[in-house]
Design a protein with these regions (language model features):
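Phosphate-binding beta-alpha-beta segment of Rossmann-like dinucleotide-binding domains, i.e.
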Residues: 94-145
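Conserved beta-strand positions in the Rossmann-like core of class I SAM-dependent methyltransferases
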Residues: 27, 170, 235
């Protein structure tokens, strides 16, 4: 009996691919490649990462498809409803990058709050003293309030780690979070979170109602020296409103790891602003996290074998 065909559109960990090869015939290629076109009609599985858009147009090319797998957490690039209308299962790896993202957020907090300087040559005593006078953090973390917008897996781990350092953590979420999962963080309304926080870190999901959630009225509630970090989805923040707010507040900082679109273009309103720091979507970029995401192949094999997947896309 021949193996079902699985198209893989992006790089996966070699060990995961080797394992999958025992359960499916693997074809590697982007949706614009000849390899994809040749295999599409009979493909029963499709594995994507961040930038392959799975919509009706792509699904039309895959009439035998049974499962779409996202080697990652967010499902923004997959039209889950369109898949379900066609009886196609959608699976992902919801906890694969939690540790990586939390570590990255911690690094960004340190970047924002604790200036550092490394020397590549000896300095005279006067210059040494001058540097030490200039490179001074304005606060310690145990003096500050960290507001966590979105208290899912990553938000909860951020609360745990930040609380251990000494931040007083508050959070806002649409759901009631069990006290055991709050790690000492206190719930509040979204307006209060922006008004009371020294630092706001955004960890909401990709539901359409979160588009433009952080808008001009919400930004106006922030303190003039606040720090805003976004490692969730670019479309959550209104970039033009953010640029207008930031331009009048030289003491504030914005660190954006995610953007809408990606990559961002020359017209991005925050380009060139001294207190805006734009990163190319790096939060989950550890070899460990990328390998973890690759093991979505286990759920691909489960679906192809007629078994329920461990991590189906959530119902919304």
């Amino acid at each position: 009996m021949s193996l079902p065909t699985c198209i893989v559109t992006a790089a996966l960990d070699d060990a995961a691919l080797d394992w999958l090869a025992g359960h499916a015939r693997i074809v590697r290629g982007s949706p614009t490649s000849a390899e994809f076109a040749a295999a599409a009609a009979g493909a029963q599985a499709l594995i994507v990462r961040t930038y392959t858009i799975v919509n009706d147009a792509l699904l039309d090319q895959l009439p035998a498809l049974r499962v779409v797998a996202r080697a990652g957490v967010g499902l923004d690039n997959i039209d889950v409803a369109a898949c379900r209308r066609r009886g196609v299962e959608v699976v992902h790896t919801p906890d694969a990058n939690t540790q990586a993202v939390v570590e990255y957020v911690l690094c960004l907090l340190c970047d924002a709050l604790r200036p550092r300087l490394f020397l590549d040559r000896p300095l005279a005593k006067d210059a040494w003293d001058d540097v030490r006078e200039e490179v001074v953090g304005a606060w310690q973390m145990d003096e500050l309030v960290l507001g966590i917008l979105g208290m899912g897996r990553i938000g909860q781990r951020v609360a745990q780690v930040a609380g251990a350092i000494g931040f007083h953590c508050i959070y806002h979420d649409l759901l009631e979070i069990p006290e055991s999962a709050r790690h000492g963080a206190e719930p509040c309304g979204i307006e209060q979170l922006f008004a009371d926080s020294d630092v706001v870190t955004v960890h909401v999901d990709g539901r359409s109602s979160n588009r433009g959630l952080v808008d001009a009225p919400l930004l106006e509630r922030l303190r003039d020296d606040a720090v805003l970090i976004n490692t969730s989805r670019g479309f959550v923040i209104d970039d033009r409103a953010l640029a207008a707010w930031l331009g009048n507040r030289p003491g504030a900082q914005v660190i954006l790891d995610v953007h809408d679109p990606e990559p961002f273009t020359h017209g991005h309103p925050l380009i060139g602003m001294a207190n805006a720091h734009l990163a190319p979507h790096l939060a989950s970029r550890t070899l460990t996290a990328m390998a973890n995401m690759s093991w979505v192949v286990k759920d691909v094999a489960a679906v192809l074998g007629g078994a329920p997947p461990r991590f189906p896309a959530p119902l919304r």
